[in-house]
Amino acid sequence: MTMTDPIADFLTRLRNANSAYHDEVTLPHSKIKANIAEILKSEGYISDYRTEDARVGKSLVVQLKYGPSRERSIAGLRRVSKPGLRVYAKSTNLPRVLGGLGVAIISTSSGLLTDRQAARSGVGGEVLAYVW
């Protein structure tokens, strides 16, 4: 069975592993998932990620990040633009997550960017997800 929304699957696996206090989560690899993981790492939501060769295809291993007393660094993840309802934003109307405390992941012509990077670059695009 083919997966209709691999980004939603990626976010759901992260959300479930985070709520179960797992140290890492393994999922099927794709370039867009690796780019999202890179954004999450640069924003401090995950500690690291790596690509491994599996028996069939590649897999992406994401190491989750917790505080000193095991408090979660990811409070929430939400998929915004879905295959059935695409959501786009202009550079002048980019969303702010929790008043700037969270991050919106935007797919632009310059690649995947955060809402702050897209505003600085003056580009808009498809709003993929919110992370806070």
Curated annotation (Swiss-Prot):
InterPro entries: Ribosomal_uS8, Ribosomal_uS8_CS, Ribosomal_uS8_sf
A Gene Ontology biological process term: translation
Pfam family, one: Ribosomal_S8
Superkingdom as given in the UniProt entry: Bacteria
Molecular function GO terms recorded: rRNA binding; structural constituent of ribosome
Keywords: Ribonucleoprotein, Ribosomal protein, RNA-binding, rRNA-binding
UniProt keyword annotation of Signal present: no
Keyword Ribonucleoprotein: yes
PROSITE patterns membership: RIBOSOMAL_S8
One GO cellular component term: ribonucleoprotein complex
Listed transmembrane segments: none
Annotated family: Belongs to the universal ribosomal protein uS8 family.
NCBIfam families given in the database record: PRK00136.1
Summary of the function given for this chain in its UniProt record: One of the primary rRNA binding proteins, it binds directly to 16S rRNA central domain where it helps coordinate assembly of the platform of the 30S subunit.
Subunit structure: Part of the 30S ribosomal subunit. Contacts proteins S5 and S12.
HAMAP family: Ribosomal_uS8_B (MF_01302_B)
Protein name: Small ribosomal subunit protein uS8
Species for this entry: Mycobacterium sp. (strain KMS)
